[in-house]
A protein has these predicted regions:
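Sec-dependent bacterial lipoprotein signal peptides
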Residues: 1-8
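Long, charged/polar, soluble alpha-helical segments
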Residues: 8-91
Length: 91
């Protein structure tokens, strides 16, 4: 049982990486100014670090970076939506 659990813990975080990439892509589609956003820059930096960590089998660290990258992108999306709603209310 212990071997089975440790094997699960060392699997590459492929789904987390994919989720982060998709969330970053969605954020970029929402707003043309996304590239200049500190949140998106941080998300991309974390995703790059996750990719490097995955290459050297640091899967748990890579998983954490991918999750943080996705979180940064989600926070940007939430901010962009609130900005859009604020502009609509001003009209």
């Amino acid at each position: 049982i212990v071997l089975a659990l440790s094997a699960c813990a060392t699997l590459p975080p492929l789904q987390e990486m994919s989720n982060a990439r998709q969330t970053i892509a969605a954020a970029k589609e929402m707003n043309p100014m996304t590239e200049q956003s500190e949140k998106i820059q941080e998300a991309e930096r974390l995703l790059s670090r996750a990719e490097r960590r995955m290459e050297v089998n640091l899967y748990e660290s890579a998983r954490q970076d991918a999750l943080r990258a996705q979180k940064e992108a989600i926070e940007f999306i939430e901010w962009a939506i609130s900005q859009s709603n604020d502009r609509k209310q001003d009209d």
